[in-house]
């Protein structure tokens, strides 16, 4: 039975304020400076100095500007580091706009296929509503980028540079989502009118033709081949003529992307450890690589990341940067904002409770480039972000180990460095992963909620 808030109750609450001695000072501080500034601790700057015992040199950072391409920038950063080192190309960047174009195009087809497949359900069905709420966004996953690279390859940034619409993607997303919603309703109508598969597919092709034209107009037409011309750090001139994006990846990166797998730490009741999971409606390339995550206990999760760093390879990872972060200082720490002291309230929650209640979810991908080990235990981590070089330590952030425990959810690891039991668990589960609901927090990096 519901009960309203009475004015007597409000009077009691008002009287209770006097029981909190720091209320007056806290109120002045919060109202003058805002909650976060008023509760900010300076100790994090002391504890998180950028010194590390295991560190990989990765050079200058990139800048995703006003777009949600963190997952793409971070993944391409792991690859460009390899190119920079092997071919002596300091400052080299891969084109994030190139993979952005093909991601938008493939996501459009992915959306239409899901709309056609769910056309028998009412628009009010939760899954259908989920599809139409955000037909596509800038977000994505490591496996989704692998699917794009396996199909389209990659190119240097100077071959397919940024545009106004890749650097600030709001108008592009608004335009594309309008086209997708309109087209999606048309496809649903055709299916429900009993039109043939051929007629439905013909209309989908017309819709994709219009979308391709819009993307080419907004971002430029991606190259089928190009000349890769550069001078290396030793002053030597090179030219690789008429190379395709697919061959560029094979020649200059050369990774077998199947050897890189996603592991997560999702300590919720619906995700048993050592099992592989996928997320419904999460993907981009129809018929391409499926998003798959192997769930591991935190201690194992962390141990494997440290081992990869020791082997000299950086680690792509997904986290929740909306919690405990100071963007200007470049710090990620659970103690940086002490709201419990400001409000005399216990804000603590378990990692599982945050995930289950919507308090936390993956919303940003970055790259781990270093760890500081004291007595063989991690104390802090160095993070390559993609927000430009004006924040943090020339664009790098320092993450406390406690923040890692609470807000790091995913990492991509090279199978070459994994123990046999972890490889076996992944290989046994990857063909028939447990499918999570579309709105699961382990899929949140790819969606706008």
From Swiss-Prot:
Catalytic reaction list: Inactivates bleomycin B2 (a cytotoxic glycometallopeptide) by hydrolysis of a carboxyamide bond of beta-aminoalanine, but also shows general aminopeptidase activity. The specificity varies somewhat with source, but amino acid arylamides of Met, Leu and Ala are preferred
Keyword Cytoplasm attributed: yes
Record-linked InterPro entries: Papain-like_cys_pep_sf, Pept_cys_AS, Peptidase_C1B
Subcellular location as annotated: Cytoplasm
Keywords: Aminopeptidase, Cytoplasm, Hydrolase, Protease, Thiol protease
GO biological process: homocysteine catabolic process; proteolysis; response to toxic substance
Protease is among the record's keywords: yes
Any one GO cellular component localisation term in the record: cytoplasm
Gene Ontology terms, MF aspect: cysteine-type aminopeptidase activity; cysteine-type endopeptidase activity
Enzyme class of the recorded protein, top EC level: hydrolase
SUPFAM superfamilies (alphabetical): Cysteine proteinases
Top-level taxon of the source organism: Bacteria
Annotated catalytic residues: 70, 364, 385
EC number: 3.4.22.40
Subunit relationships: Homohexamer.
Family named by the database record: Belongs to the peptidase C1 family.
Protein name as annotated: Aminopeptidase C
Annotated source species: Lactobacillus delbrueckii subsp. lactis
Upper taxonomic lineage: Bacteria, Bacillati, Bacillota, Bacilli, Lactobacillales
């Amino acid at each position: 039975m519901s009960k309203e808030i009475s004015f007597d109750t409000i009077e009691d609450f008002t009287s209770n304020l006097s029981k909190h001695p720091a209320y007056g000072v806290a109120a002045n501080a919060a109202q003058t400076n805002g909650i976060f500034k008023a509760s900010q601790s300076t100790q994090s700057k002391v504890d998180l100095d950028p010194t590390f015992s295991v560190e990989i040199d990765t050079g200058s950072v990139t800048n995703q500007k006003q777009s949600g391409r963190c997952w793409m920038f971070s993944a391409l950063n792991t690859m460009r580091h390899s190119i920079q080192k092997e071919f002596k190309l300091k400052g080299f960047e891969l084109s994030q706009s190139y993979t952005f174009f093909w991601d938008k195009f493939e996501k459009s087809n992915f959306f239409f296929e899901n709309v056609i497949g769910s056309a028998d359900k009412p628009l009010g069905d939760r899954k259908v509503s989920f599809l139409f709420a955000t037909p596509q966004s800038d977000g994505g996953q490591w496996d989704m980028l692998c699917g794009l690279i396996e199909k389209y390859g990659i190119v240097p940034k100077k071959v397919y540079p940024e545009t106004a619409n890749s650097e600030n993607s709001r108008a592009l997303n608004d335009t594309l989502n309008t086209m997708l919603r309109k087209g999606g309703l048309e496809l649903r109508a055709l299916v429900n009118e009993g039109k043939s598969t051929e007629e439905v597919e013909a209309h989908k092709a017309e819709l994709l033709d219009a979308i391709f034209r819009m993307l080419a107009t907004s971002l430029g037409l991606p190259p089928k081949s190009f000349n890769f011309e550069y001078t290396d750090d030793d002053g030597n001139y090179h030219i690789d003529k008429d190379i395709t994006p697919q061959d560029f990846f094979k020649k200059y990166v050369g990774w077998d992307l199947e050897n890189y797998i996603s592991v997560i730490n999702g300590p919720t009741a619906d995700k048993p450890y050592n099992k592989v999971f996928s997320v419904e409606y999460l993907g981009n390339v129809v018929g391409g690589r499926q998003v798959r995550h192997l769930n591991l206990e935190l201690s194992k999760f962390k141990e494997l990341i440290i081992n990869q760093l020791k082997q000299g390879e950086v680690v792509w990872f997904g986290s929740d940067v909306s919690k405990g972060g100071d963007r200007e200082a470049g710090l990620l720490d659970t103690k940086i904002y002490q709201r419990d002291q400001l409000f005399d309230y216990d804000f603590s929650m378990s990692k599982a409770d945050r995930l289950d209640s919507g308090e936390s979810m993956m919303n940003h991908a970055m790259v781990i480039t270093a760890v500081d080990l004291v007595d063989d235990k991690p104390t802090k981590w160095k993070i390559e972000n993609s927000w430009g070089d004006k924040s943090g330590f020339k664009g790098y952030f320092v993450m406390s180990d406690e923040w890692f425990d609470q807000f790091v959810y995913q990492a991509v690891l090279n199978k070459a460095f994994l123990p046999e039991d972890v490889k076996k668990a992944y290989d046994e589960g990857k063909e028939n992963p447990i499918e999570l609901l579309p709105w699961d927090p382990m899929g949140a990096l790819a969606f706008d909620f």
